[in-house]
């Protein structure tokens, strides 16, 4: 899209990257890669409840074990699909490993309070803020991983969607 923005009729200053869960990992990784490669310039990154830390050492990754919802075991299986045994992951595979979060695009994100990735996301958001990156983040009480996809008609899901759309509208209207 960035390389062919003229052909596509796309404003190269209004590009965002977004993803859910493992896709949230990819969105954060693409933001890091775009920064490190000096392009494309992203106006927003939207890693929603991203799987950001392959170490699975946070309190929430230890305490969310109910197999009726996304839990620690699911996280481990997910990471095992991405990382080979003995492989030392990079920041592009596990964005929480990044030493430097400065110079990244603004972030919008949300997560459920009962998501095993809650604490790794909270830590990542805090590190972004400490690096001077604008961050808008929301933790939805009583909600689990992918809650807005599981129960899209719920008021909390509608609120999560509207907050996301509003963040994208704001990012795309700047310029």
Where are these regions (language model features)?
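Alpha/beta-hydrolase superfamily serine-hydrolase fold, recognizing
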Residues: 1-175
């Amino acid at each position: 899209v960035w390389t062919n923005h003229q052909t596509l009729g796309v404003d190269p200053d209004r590009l965002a990257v977004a993803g859910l869960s493992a896709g949230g990992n990819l969105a954060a990784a693409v933001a890091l890669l775009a920064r490190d490669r000096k392009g494309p310039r992203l106006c927003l990154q939207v890693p929603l409840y991203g799987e950001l830390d392959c170490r699975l050492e946070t309190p929430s990754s230890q305490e969310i074990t109910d197999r009726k919802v996304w839990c620690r075991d699911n996280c481990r299986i997910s990471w095992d699909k991405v990382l080979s045994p003995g492989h030392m992951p990079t920041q592009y595979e596990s964005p929480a490993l990044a030493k430097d979060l400065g110079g990244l695009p603004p972030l919008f994100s949300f997560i459920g309070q009962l998501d095993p990735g809650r604490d790794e996301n909270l830590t990542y958001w805090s590190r972004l803020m400490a690096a001077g990156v604008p961050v808008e983040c929301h933790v939805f009480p009583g909600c689990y991983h992918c809650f807005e996809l599981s129960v899209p008609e719920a008021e909390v899901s509608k609120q999560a969607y509207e907050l996301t759309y509003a963040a994208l509208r704001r990012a795309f209207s700047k310029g």
